[in-house]
């Protein structure tokens, strides 16, 4: 059974489309796998100018799958009835109430998200070398069955649907093989696993500085003195008051 981060009950995951995928991943993948759900990212790009300008970009990834034996995979999930309209090159989702809304291209989202993870890994650890393990992305339509041709920017080998959920382990193994550009599978070594864990889930600490602690203590003393003066005033005005 894989480990889910954050450590929440799967029944509390929303939307249901992601809950189904989370359950399949946690129950079927091995114990050394880590599944990051709703992983947020933020990175900056520098644009030319005088002076150069930095712009922040943000996003959220449905699932980041860290499987040491095979690599790292970003998984974008779409639920409900999904349609791609070729003449418009747009994607649409229809909910249970029959309401249809245009949505973002899931393959473009997944591609953008793996690029963000790649940039994060390169910035923190792998700036002077290629990332030494397999990484890629896939899209899962957890409430639909896939049929027909594939839209531009996609590939059958990185598409999952509801039929893949009962066998998601073997399906993901196949996807990793398609993203592997080396002659043999590039797994994540224990050393790299430690680095990736520290990058994706860094330890965040706030340590009070001494001057701040002194200021807090002085403020407490002032409050105590004010309280004591207030009590003395009350005692003076009420001779029958007792203080324990």
Regions found by a protein language model. Give the residues of each.
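Intrinsically disordered, low-complexity Ser/Thr/Pro/Gly-rich regulatory segments
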Residues: 1-223, 229, 234
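Glycine-rich phosphate-binding P-loop
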Residues: 228-229, 243
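Walker A/P-loop
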Residues: 237-244
